[in-house]
Amino acid sequence: MYFELKENKPHGTKDDPFSTYHIENAGRSFQIPVHWHDEFEIIYVRSGFLTVSISGESYIGKTGEAFVVSPGNLHLMGAQTGTVDYYTFLFPLKYISFRTDDMLDEKLLEPLNSGHLMICPRVKDTAKELCEQLIEIYEAKKDESESKITTQVRTKIILLQFILEMWKKGFVIE
């Protein structure tokens, strides 16, 4: 692993380790430098085209498509030209664990966290609806129209639905 490329920016807080980042780029090229972190990340292209590289594989994401970055995977995002509007959702996998050492933890979440399992990086538009729901929660959190407990419960439910969809569609691989 390239320790010098580890992102040192803290994501979330102790009380709420889930982070949402919204990047809207109007017409000029940009690139988020190659990096890795311990959190699980979902990258969702709300509109436009986004170049995404995950573990050396490059993709062009278009409107409604999502990508998954497993903990520890090198990745970068950018756009050469044009306008892109995208979100990244980051969280430690233990955030959605029930911490009971049950089958979900033992057979899925812990292997995803340790790299023994991963979710295919490109999940196309499979997660569009769930990502849009996460954006709704992000907006409610910003304008404080819901309690912090409500937004956290809603977020965890959607993230568990995301993991379930990836499992059911065969996107979880060794």
Where are the model-predicted features located?
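A hydrophobic/aromatic-rich effector-binding and dimerization subdomain
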Residues: 2-19, 74-140
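An amphipathic alpha-helical interaction segment
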Residues: 123-174
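Conserved metal-binding segment of the jelly-roll/cupin
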Residues: 61-74
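Short loop segments at secondary-structure junctions
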Residues: 47-49, 72, 94
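Generic protein-terminus/edge-of-domain signal
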Residues: 1-62, 106, 117
